[in-house]
From Swiss-Prot:
Membership in a protein family: Belongs to the cytochrome c oxidase subunit 2 family.
This protein's name: Cytochrome c oxidase subunit 2
Binding-site positions, Cu cation A2: 196, 198, 200, 204
InterPro entries: CcO_II, CcO_II-like_C, CcO_II_C, Copper_CuA, Cupredoxin, Cyt_c_oxidase_su2, Cyt_c_oxidase_su2_TM_dom, Cyt_c_oxidase_su2_TM_sf
Residues binding Mg(2+), per UniProt: 198
Species, as recorded: Rousettus leschenaultii
Keyword terms: Copper, Electron transport, Magnesium, Membrane, Metal-binding, Mitochondrion, Mitochondrion inner membrane, Phosphoprotein, Respiratory chain, Translocase, Transmembrane, Transmembrane helix, Transport
Complex and partners: Component of the cytochrome c oxidase (complex IV, CIV), a multisubunit enzyme composed of 14 subunits. The complex is composed of a catalytic core of 3 subunits MT-CO1, MT-CO2 and MT-CO3, encoded in the mitochondrial DNA, and 11 supernumerary subunits COX4I, COX5A, COX5B, COX6A, COX6B, COX6C, COX7A, COX7B, COX7C, COX8 and NDUFA4, which are encoded in the nuclear genome.
Coiled coil ranges: none
Biological process (GO), any one: ATP synthesis coupled electron transport
Cofactor(s) listed in the protein's UniProt record: Cu cation
C-alpha cells in the first residue's frame, strides 16, 4: 500500500513484482556507475591541463568504448528478457477472471462459475466509512485466492483503459475488440489497490481497482455466497 511522500515502490506481493524490484536495483546500479564515471572524467578534464591535443587516432580507446557499452547492454537485456518471459507464462491457472473496462467503472466475470459477475464502482467520498481510502474504495471488491495462479482476461467496452495493480506488478491495457491476458499470484493475503492507468475521459481518476486476496477456504465460502 502506498503512503504519503513515498519515494520507493510499494512492497512486492507477487514473485513477478519481486523480480521487477531486483531488476530495477540492478539497472539503477549500472546507471549509477556510468554516471559516476562520466562525472569523474568531466572533473578530470576541468581540473587538468589538456595534453595530446594533436592525437588523431586511438585504436585502444575506440575498442574499449565499443565493447564496454555492448557488454553493459547485454547485462541489462538478459535479465529483462527473462522477466518478460516470466510475465507471459501461464501454467494451469486455478481461476480465470474476465475484466471489462467501462467509462468509468470495471466489471468482472468469474468464467469458471456459471453466473458470477458484478460491476465495481468507486465509493463516493461522502459514503466512505472510517478507515476507508478516498478515491480508492469500491462497492464490490475482486475476491481471489492467494498462493494460486489467477488468469486475468482484460478488455474494454468503449475506450482504452489500463488495469493496473502496482504491488502485484500488474499493468495490462484494456483495448476495445481485443482480449489481453495476464497472470497474478499473491504470496500473502490482504487488500491491494490499483487504478485505471490510461487516460480515458473526464472521470479517468475515478476508476479504482481493489483486490482482496484471501486463503482458498475463505474464497470458496465467498464464491458459494455469490452464486
Amino acid at each position: 500500500m502506498a503512503y504519503p511522500f513515498q519515494l520507493g515502490f510499494q512492497d512486492a506481493t507477487s514473485p513477478i513484482m519481486e523480480e521487477l524490484l531486483h531488476f530495477h536495483d540492478h539497472a539503477l546500479m549500472i546507471v549509477f556507475l556510468i554516471s559516476s564515471l562520466v562525472l569523474y572524467l568531466i572533473s578530470v578534464m576541468l581540473t587538468t591541463s589538456l595534453t595530446h591535443t594533436s592525437t588523431m587516432d586511438a585504436q585502444e580507446v575506440e575498442t574499449i568504448w565499443t565493447i564496454l557499452p555492448a557488454m553493459i547492454l547485454i547485462m541489462i537485456a538478459l535479465p529483462s528478457l527473462r522477466i518478460l518471459y516470466m510475465m507471459d507464462e501461464i501454467n494451469n491457472p486455478y481461476l480465470t477472471v474476465k475484466t471489462m473496462g467501462h467509462q468509468w467503472y470495471w466489471s468482472y466475470e468469474y468464467t469458471d462459475y456459471e453466473d458470477m459477475s458484478f460491476d465495481s464502482y468507486m465509493v463516493p467520498t461522502q459514503d466512505l466509512k472510517p478507515g476507508e481510502l478516498r478515491l480508492l474504495e469500491v462497492d464490490n471488491r475482486v475476491v481471489l485466492p492467494m498462493e494460486l495462479t489467477i488468469r486475468m482476461l482484460i478488455s474494454s467496452e468503449d475506450v482504452l483503459h489500463s488495469w493496473a495493480v502496482p504491488s502485484l506488478g500488474l499493468k495490462t491495457d484494456a483495448i476495445p475488440g481485443r482480449l489481453n491476458q495476464t497472470t497474478l499470484l499473491s504470496t500473502r493475503p490482504g487488500l491491494y489497490y490499483g487504478q485505471c492507468s490510461e487516460i480515458c475521459g473526464s472521470n479517468h481518476s475515478f476508476m479504482p481497482i481493489v483486490l482482496e486476496l484471501v486463503p482458498l477456504k475463505y474464497f470458496e465460502k465467498w464464491s458459494s455466497s455469490m452464486l
